[in-house]
Every structure is written in C-alpha cells, then in structure tokens.
C-alpha cells in the first residue's frame, strides 16, 4: 500500500495510516519563493511540522520496525548545477529526513529534489526508487538529468605546505568554544 502525504497529516486525520503501508511519498509544495511569500512564510510554513508529524505518527503506529520506503520530493531546494534558482523551502525537510534515516535503519529514506514536475521526473523517481540500493540518500533532477550526491576522496596536503598564521594578523574565532575551536584559539594564543 502506498501513502501520499497531504495536509491531512497537519490536521491529524491519518486513521488509515497503519503498518500495512510500505511506501510513503512526502511532497513539499513548490512555487513559494516570492519575496512576499518568504516574508510571511517563516511564521506560517508548516511543511517541516507536517513531516515531523508524519514521522511521529509512523512511530506511534509501531511502523519504525517495518521495512518502509519513504521518498521526500522537494522543488529546487539546492543549487546543483551552479546556476539553479533555488526555493529554500524543503531543505529543512531534507535535513530532518536525513537525520531520521540515521535513526531508523528499517526505513529506506530517499530525498529527491526536482526542478520541474513532468512525466520524465516521475519516471526518474520511479527508477531511483526501484533500482536504488539505498547507498545514496539525496538525488536531484535537473533538465532531464539525475544527479547523485556522493563523497569524493581528496588528498590532504602535508603540514609543510599549509600557510601558517600570520604573526601580525588578528584572528576572530566565531563559535566553537570547546573542542576544535578551543584548540585553535589556544594554538593562536601561543603564537
């Protein structure tokens, strides 16, 4: 059984939402990036709350032990190609979804950020859902192409090639009062 999330989650009317559900699709509304909308939206946007309520409802219904596919669909939440115009709404839901993915290993959570909703987009989403091994959690669809977020190996230069602090400069450390921030501050002070 597939369940497509709408505003009924916000309103709490999800009685039919139980452990027979095997696939959940959560779609973040698109077309909300106008300046006037942005000004008001911080007080009224319920998308992240809606996703939180969805996860809470699934856990209350003891679905956290079930193998469930959860797909989050956003609209241009990230600049993938370097020249995308973005709509930041949905990026908070993606962040929350990636956290839930780490916490509840039975759920295969996949985030899919698209520039347009077309038949090609739907086909790409279905293909990813069908063939994905779950190795990646974030996909983007731009101009008919699928992009996959992945970590790349990089070489770290040896210490001798890193430019040292300038003895006469002023260093401002923002945040990080413990851990790395404290060590950096102590190192700077020693110099």
Stretches with model-predicted labels:
Residues 25-33, 75:
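Conserved NAD(P)H cofactor-binding loop of Rossmann-fold oxidoreductase domains
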Residues 9-13, 53-57, 183:
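Short alpha-helical segments and helix-capping/turn motifs at coil-helix boundaries
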């Amino acid at each position: 059984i597939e369940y497509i999330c709408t505003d009924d989650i916000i309103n709490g009317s999800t009685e039919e939402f139980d452990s027979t559900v095997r696939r959940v699709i959560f779609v973040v509304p698109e077309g909300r990036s106008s300046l006037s909308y942005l000004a008001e939206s911080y007080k009224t946007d319920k998308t992240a709350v809606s996703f939180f309520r969805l996860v809470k409802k699934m856990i209350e219904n003891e679905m956290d032990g079930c193998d469930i596919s959860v797909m989050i669909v956003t609209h241009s939440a990230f600049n993938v190609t370097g020249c995308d115009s973005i709509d930041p709404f949905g990026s908070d839901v993606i962040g929350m979804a990636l956290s839930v993915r780490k916490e509840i290993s039975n759920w295969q959570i996949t985030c899919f950020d698209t520039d347009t909703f077309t038949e090609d987009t739907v086909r790409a989403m279905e293909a990813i859902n069908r063939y994905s091994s779950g190795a990646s959690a974030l996909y983007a669809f731009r101009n008919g192409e699928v992009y996959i977020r992945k970590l790349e190996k990089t070489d770290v230069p040896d210490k001798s090639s890193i430019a040292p602090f300038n003895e006469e400069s002023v260093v401002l450390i923002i945040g990080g009062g413990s851990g790395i921030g404290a060590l950096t501050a102590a190192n700077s002070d020693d110099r």
